[in-house]
Structures are given as structure tokens and as C-alpha cells.
Amino acid sequence: LTPLASGFRQPNGVGLSPDGDFFVNENQGDYKPSCGLLHVAQGDFHGHVASLKWEPGFDAKTFTTEQAWKRYKSPAVVFPHGPMGVSGGEILWDTTGGKFGPFAGQVFAGDYTKIVIRAALEKVAGEWQGVCFPFLGRNETAAYTSGEKLLAGITRSTFAPDGSLYLGAAGGWGAGANGLQRVVWDREVSPEVRDVKLTDRGFRLTFTRPMSAATLATAANFEVNRFRYYYQYKYGSPWVDEARVAVTAVRPSADGLSAELALA
């Protein structure tokens, strides 16, 4: 056997993208401030130092967090702990060709808190990065207060040939009932942000359906905040350096399906 990568804590979901890229859904804990999608390639180190004990010359008594940080490969997508769940499950690409709604090619991930997260990925300068959105369920955080409650935490998921989504729960996880739940698209397209991509000045938002010119033309209609986590041996991390980021300009597209935000 040849090791592929190191630095994992407890991934509960693994998956291959349609293009064959390998991702895992890591779980929060020591050296892991939050759950999130990790892109895995040969030789990567994903932050948890326990697996380094098999490396020649490794000395746990002298090895420091600073040394680990220099090798650390950041997650492609961070799921903010709390609003976007607390313990992730399997990751699944929408390969239904539109049978499940306007999210073809995007990623879905279940969570212990009875929700499903939606994520969109892009490759920038050879590295994967992306964004996550509330999608399904309800866990009483600000991001998930209006959806229907799922019966259990989600550990496994799969698409059926008809495009419906099956969500699987496992006994012993302490997150509600066991068994399967089936999600079917009702053919209605709700107004959502479909994707967010990085630009030189800020971000480009793409929507699932056209938005009004009045909505997109007003910078005050968009709120952007930032924060970061500590990388540390302690369990998890608080949100650090939270701050509002001013939206200085909005440039909507003529069809109302996208808008570019310029940030201060």
C-alpha cells in the first residue's frame, strides 16, 4: 500500500467528482476548526498531526503547530460550524442533468443536525475553492429556520435514476430516527444564489432565476461579513476577527441572472 495523503481527523464522507477529483467531508475537532470539503491529492497534509508519526524523523516532542501550518492544505470549502452543521456526512455530486433542479454539477452534503448543505466548486490557479449554501432541513440557526425538518441526521445519500435524492440515517449517531428519506424536486425554481465566484474586485453572484433591476442595483441589499478560525491543537475554534465588509458597488447583468459586487 502507498499512502496518498495525511492530516485527516475523521472524514465521514468521501466522493469523486465527475472529473475524478477526490474529496472528503472532514469533521470538526482538534486541529480542525470546522467541517468542510477537502480536495485530496498525492502528498497533501490536511492539518491533523497524528498521522505524521509514520513519517521518518518525526518527533512529537519537538514538532510545533507552526511547522504543521507551513504544510497545511486549506479546505476547498469551509462549512461554518453551527450555521452549516456540526458533523458532516457523505458528499454527493448532482449528476441528474437537471432532474433535481438548477444545481447540476454542484455538491450536496448531509449533516448530523438534520440538514443538507449545497456547495459549488471552482478551480483557481490550480487549486479548488468554493462556497456553501443552506439547502434542506432545519437546525434552528439563522441559516436554517424556514425549511421543513428532516427526521434524522444524514450520514449517507444517493440519487435515484428518476433524479430524486435518498437520504440515509444511521443508528447510534444520536440524531433522530433511523432509515431513509426521499426528496423530490417539485419543479419550482426558488430565488436563490446559485453560485459565487471570485473576481479581481470582489465576487460574482449567479442566481437561479432573474432578479429585479431594483434589487440588484442597490448595494445596501447585499451584506458581506468575514471571519477566520484559529488553527490549533484544541478542539474547534471560535470565530475570530469578525467584521462587516462594505459593498462599494454592484454591477448587475442585463438579464438579471448575475451581479458583480465590488468590496472595500
Residue ranges of model-derived segments:
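Structural beta-strand segments of beta-rich domains
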Residues: 201-205, 259
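A surface-exposed beta-strand-loop module
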Residues: 251-264
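Short, solvent-exposed loop/linker segments at the N-terminal edge
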Residues: 195-199
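Short, surface-exposed loop motifs enriched in S/T, G, D/E and P with embedded aromatic residues
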Residues: 121, 135, 244-252
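A mature extracytoplasmic/lumenal domain signature
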Residues: 28, 171, 209-211, 263
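Short, surface-exposed alpha-helix to beta-strand junction/turn motifs within ectodomains of secreted
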Residues: 204-248
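Beta-propeller domains with acidic blade repeats across secreted/periplasmic ectodomains
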Residues: 1-190
